[in-house]
Every structure is written in structure tokens, then in C-alpha cells.
Swiss-Prot record:
InterPro entries: ATP-synt_VA_C (IPR055190), ATP-synth_a_Xtn (IPR031686), ATP_synth_asu-like_sf (IPR023366), ATPase_a/bsu_AS (IPR020003), ATPase_F1/V1/A1_a/bsu_N (IPR004100), ATPase_F1/V1/A1_a/bsu_N_sf (IPR036121), ATPase_F1/V1/A1_a/bsu_nucl-bd (IPR000194), ATPase_F1/V1_b/a_C (IPR024034). Coiled coil: none annotated. The gene is atpA. This is V-type ATP synthase alpha chain. It catalyses: ATP + H2O + 4 H(+)(in) = ADP + phosphate + 5 H(+)(out). It comes from Streptococcus pneumoniae serotype 4 (strain ATCC BAA-334 / TIGR4). Belongs to the ATPase alpha/beta chains family. ATP binds at G233, P234, F235, G236, A237, G238, K239, T240. The lineage of its organism: Bacteria, Bacillati, Bacillota, Bacilli, Lactobacillales. GO terms for cellular component: proton-transporting ATP synthase complex. SUPFAM superfamilies: C-terminal domain of alpha and beta subunits of F1 ATP synthase, N-terminal domain of alpha and beta subunits of F1 ATP synthase, P-loop containing nucleoside triphosphate hydrolases. It comes from the Bacteria. Disulfide bonds: none annotated.
Length: 591
């Protein structure tokens, strides 16, 4: 433990002298109030400290004491359905301790509740040999999450005592005799430094799709469990709603939502909506699988930088249990702005637009902690982390450094489009500029599992949208009447795909989530209509005949998005009606 004294205060950056014994990444207590800070640079005996609390009132001469530990999070029962700030302070218990609606400086509250007793069920016998990652037992944390207690990293040996029963998280639950003869006394909780990735046994290629219930994502731009996606877009294009929708309905075991530098109202929406929503996969409240990290725009800037790492470390902990985890970061641009501010105060050489030269490597560091892995320990298990980051480029300009560095790393780009949002087409994901590099592997996976030709259907639907885009220019110049019947039919089918399939109402109780079976039925109907109508044109029918003769059935296709999941048969029989209707048109008109 080293004690120094402050010689300079510059916003969230404090410089202290007499710190020659300290190390980079050590946590310090700064000033008389004991504010939390982290050493980010050492020059001789001077330490530059990033302070995670408001620094007003700090002055030269005040003491700085190092703890000798890096910034770490507490991992154990009590994480789920809690809300923390960027450095894992529990906001509800912080309010009870301080009787204040705002974060009072210098107050220390344990991250996990020390008073709650959790029922621990041992799954291992005394005398058994264990090593890092082995599951010792379970704690039923919520109706949905079975919290697995694992041997901490770096510990291996023989279990000499373990007992089932009710324990708080700091009571000794088991004892391991290590290989060197010393004894390790273990609790239900372990600590881990946030800037260090938790080790795994083996990295695997992601294959299984993350089903989000959002048709444009699942069909055209899928992300796998263990993949990484970016959602850039201008203000008002719907980034936060896309993130909320994925957090609500993704088929994962755990969701970690990091509100990083965005408005506080968005976190309030999450707190109001999530407890009332039912997870379609488990039938329980969505809050029972969610951890919230709130670092809103009115909280200290430096803590934004930590919040992303806090979230991904928690995600790695649940992945090590063998769970699939989705982490949403809204927004990584605010995190990058925090990096830029600290870099400027450290007087480092600026890169593009004032961001530090190491911006790209920091963004890569975060996204590379996502993935599908075979984790350490027995029984053998796989876990996944899917990282979805919103990016808020100023003015919607995706050529700026944060977006460009993000797109170099992630394999899925959901590009939100201001013109689509202005036309009230939501989700406003532009199907011509967005992409997914997982598309082929996901299509092959679904074709094999569901025994469908999903891949070819998606390709055909996308072809219609691309042909519509090239025909739109002709229509704008010389009018729709200049098009042939075949081209007008292409425009009509593309319009159906856009309005009846891609457009989705997040605030409608039925349309907010679409299962894969319903998505497939809806798209099949549109493509059946395309096949039958093209066939009728080949046999001599007119475009206007086909449109007038299929008004009722096309109306049913348009309304099928509002048909509930338990009435799927009503959607599936529409394809028979389309075929019947086109046959009637051929019998009465055409040749």
C-alpha cells in the first residue's frame, strides 16, 4: 500500500506524486473523501489517476492511497435482476445506504449483498480431485437461472470439506487442499479484474443463430450465438429500440444490458418494461435473466470506460457456467468519447478526430472477448457471448473513426437509415447497405435443422428488393407506366416484402416478436404469390387482372403479422388460397 499526494487535478484526471511503489491499473483512494480511481499512467514517481467519481473540491496536497488491487468485479449469486453502475456499485442499495437519489462521493457499498442467504446444493464429494472451472454445486438464483459455483482460476487440488445448506456469499462453503499442501477456503463469490479476459479451454466457430424475433434481422442479417454485431445510426433511427427488442426476445440464457453514456430515460424504460414482459422461451419475467449496468450521460465520464469492461467480465462469468449470454452496449460511441477525453487530458498524440491512436485496439479488445468457447473445468460444456454494440456517429456519418474501427471487427452490420425512419419504416435497417457474414452458415444450419430451403428463399427475397432499387430510378424519371408487366410485378412483390414482412411494430403485443416458424410461413406466402403471379403473366394474364383478382388474399397476407403464434395454421393455408385465386384468374381471363 503506497501513499502519495495530489499535485494536479484536471477534471476526472488526478496526478499524484510519491507513488513510485504503485503499479499501472492499481485502484486508489483519492483525497480526504476516498474517491475511487485507477492508475492509467506512471512517470517516475508520478501517477496519472482516472477518477470514477466527481472530482470537484479535490485539491493539491490531499492524500492518495493505493489498494494494490486492479479494478475488479464481484462474481457470485445476486447479480441477476440487479442494476449496477459502471464500477459495479449496486444502485438500489447505494440509495438505501446514503438516503440520496444521487451518487454520494466516497461511499463504499459491497457490490453483492452480504446479508442474503443462498441455498447451495453440492454436486461433488469430499476427497474428489478438482481443478479450475470444475462445478462444485449450484444455487437457484431465480426461477430461470441456476447459478453454478465453480473452482476459481488458479486453484486445483483435493476437496477436504464441502457442505450443502444456506450460506451468505462471504461464508466459507468448501475447502480445497492445493498441490503445494496449502489450503484454499472458498466462498460462493469470486473476484476478477475487469480488463483481463477470463481464460477458456478452446475457441470454437459460432454456428447456431441467435433468434431475436425481429424478421429483418433473423431473415436477412442474422447473428450467431457467439457473434458480434454493430448497430450504427443517426439520432432517432431506432438504435435503442433495436437493442431493447433483442434484449427482450433473444433465445439466450442471460442478457447483460450496458447503458453507457446514453439518456437516463432509456434505462427507466428498461426498468419499467422488462419486469412486465414474459420471456417466450421460459414463460418467466425477462428481468429474471437480466443484469443492468447503468452509466447514464449525467454520471462521471471516466466510469463509462469501466462500464463496458464490467459488463463483458460478467458475461464471461456466466459463459463459464455453460450459458449463452448476450451483451448489449448502448452506446460504444460514448465509451470512445470517454477514451478521447482521458487521452486529451494525458496530452497524448491524437489520432483521427481527436480519438486516441489506440482506439481500434481498445474496440477490438472488447469485441474479441465475445465468441463461442469450450470452457475450463468439468463437466465439459460450451458457452457463448454475443456482443451487440450500438454506435452513435455524429450526424449519422458512418465514415467516422468509431464506426469504421467497429466495422473492421464485427461480422454483422445493421445499418439504420434516417430516410427509412422518417418514412416510419421500423426497424429502420437498410437492407441494401447492411450485411451479415454469418448469413450462409446460418442458412445452412437452419436448412439442416428445420429441413427447409430457407437459404434460397432469403436469396430470392433479397433479389426482389435489389431489383426494386434499380427500377425505382426509372420510375422516378419516366413514371411507373413505362415498366413492363413483369417489372411492375417485381415492384409489387418487393413492396410486399418491405411492408408486410420487414416492417415490424415493436409496440404491438403480437407483432413485437415473430417465431421462426411464423417468419418462414409469412415469407413462403409472399414467394408463392410471386411464383403464381409470374406463371400467370407467362400464360398471358395482365398485371392489373392479377392485382384486382387477388385483393382479398393480399390483404390477408398483409395482416398475417398480427396473427398470434397459436393460430399459425391461418397463415399457412394462405398459400393454397393464392394458388386457387390465380387459377380462377387464368380460367376467366388471360389467353
Amino acid at each position: 500500500m503506497t501513499q502519495g499526494k495530489i499535485i494536479k487535478v484536471s477534471g476526472p484526471l488526478v496526478i499524484a506524486s510519491g507513488m513510485q511503489e504503485a503499479n499501472i491499473q492499481d485502484i486508489c483512494r483519492v483525497g480526504k473523501l476516498g474517491l475511487i480511481g485507477e492508475i492509467i499512467e506512471m512517470r517516475r514517481d508520478q501517477a496519472s489517476i482516472q477518477v470514477y467519481e466527481e472530482t470537484s473540491g479535490l485539491g493539491p496536497g490531499e492524500p492518495v492511497v493505493t489498494t494494490g488491487e486492479p479494478l475488479s468485479v464481484e462474481l457470485g449469486p445476486g447479480l441477476i435482476s440487479q442494476m449496477f453502475d459502471g464500477i459495479q456499485r449496486p444502485l438500489d442499495r447505494f440509495k438505501l445506504a446514503t438516503h440520496n437519489d444521487f451518487l454520494v462521493r466516497g461511499v463504499e457499498v459491497p457490490s453483492l449483498d452480504r446479508d442474503i442467504k443462498w441455498h447451495f446444493d453440492s454436486t461433488i464429494a469430499i476427497g474428489q480431485k478438482v481443478s479450475t472451472g470444475d462445478i462444485l454445486g449450484t444455487v437457484k438464483e431465480t426461477e430461470v437461472v441456476n447459478h453454478k459455483i465453480m473452482v476459481p482460476y488458479g486453484v486445483s487440488g483435493e476437496v477436504v470439506s464441502i457442505a450443502s445448506g444456506d450460506f451468505t456469499i462471504d461464508e466459507v462453503v468448501y475447502e480445497i487442499k492445493k498441490l503445494d499442501g496449502s489450503f484454499y477456503k472458498g466462498t460462493l463469490m469470486q473476484k476478477w479484474p475487469v480488463r483481463k479476459a477470463r481464460p477458456v479451454s478452446k475457441r470454437l466457430i459460432p454456428e447456431e443463430p441467435l433468434i431475436t424475433g425481429q424478421r429483418v434481422i433473423d431473415a436477412f442479417f442474422p447473428v450467431t450465438k457467439g457473434g458480434a454485431a454493430a448497430v450504427p445510426g443517426p439520432f432517432g433511427a431506432g438504435k435503442t429500440v433495436v437493442q431493447h427488442q433483442v434484449a427482450k426476445f433473444a433465445n439466450v440464457d442471460i442478457v447483460i444490458y450496458v447503458g453507457c453514456g446514453e439518456r437516463g430515460n432509456e434505462m427507466t424504460d428498461v426498468l419499467n418494461e422488462f419486469p412486465e414482459l414474459i420471456d417466450p422461451n421460459t414463460g418467466q419475467s425477462i428481468m429474471q435473466r437480466t443484469v443492468l449496468i447503468a452509466n447514464t450521460s449525467n454520471m462521471p465520464v471516466a466510469a463509462r470506460e469501466a462500464s463496458i469492461y464490467t459488463g463483458i467480465t460478467m458475461a464471461e462469468y456466466f459463459r463459464d457456467m455453460g450459458y449463452s449470454v448476450a451483451i448489449m452496449a448502448d452506446s460504444t460511441s460514448r465509451w470512445a468519447e470517454a477514451l478521447r477525453e482521458m487521452s486529451g487530458r494525458l496530452e497524448e498524440m491524437p489520432g483521427d478526430e481527436g480519438y486516441p491512436a489506440y482506439l481500434g485496439s481498445r474496440i477490438a479488445e472488447y469485441y474479441e472477448r465475445a465468441g463461442r468457447s469450450q470452457v475450463l473445468g468439468l463437466p465439459e460444456r460450451e458457452g457463448t457471448i454475443t456482443a451487440i454494440g450500438a454506435v452513435s456517429p455524429p450526424g449519422g456519418d458512418i465514415s467516422e473513426p468509431v464506426t469504421q474501427n467497429t466495422l473492421r471487427i464485427v461480422k454483422v452490420f445493421w445499418g439504420l437509415d434516417a430516410p427509412l425512419a422518417q418514412r416510419r419504416h421500423f426497424p429502420a435497417i437498410n437492407w441494401l447497405t447492411s450485411y451479415s457474414l454469418y448469413k450462409d452458415s446460418v442458412g445452412t444450419y437452419i436448412d439442416g435443422k428445420e429441413k427447409t430451403d430457407w437459404n434460397s428463399k432469403i436469396t430470392r427475397a433479397m433479389n426482389y428488393l435489389q431489383r426494386e432499387s434499380s427500377l425505382e430510378e426509372i420510375v422516378r424519371l419516366v413514371g411507373i407506366d413505362s415498366l413492363s408487366d413483369n417489372e411492375r410485378l417485381t415492384m409489387e412483390i418487393a413492396k410486399q416484402i418491405r411492408e408486410d414482412y420487414l416492417q415490424q411494430n415493436a409496440f404491438d403485443s403480437v407483432d413485437t416478436f415473430t417465431s421462426f416458424a411464423k417468419q418462414e410461413a409469412m415469407l413462403s406466402n409472399i414467394l408463392t404469390f410471386a411464383d403464381q403471379a409470374n406463371h400467370a403473366l407467362e400464360l398471358g394474364s395482365y398485371f392489373t387482372e392479377i392485382m384486382e383478382g387477388t385483393v382479398a388474399v393480399r390483404d390477408r397476407m398483409a395482416r398475417s403479422k398480427y396473427v398470434s403464434e397459436d393460430r399459425l395454421d391461418e397463415i399457412k393455408i394462405i398459400s393454397n388460397e393464392i394458388t386457387h385465386q390465380i387459377h380462377l384468374i387464368l380460367e376467366t381471363g388471360g389467353l
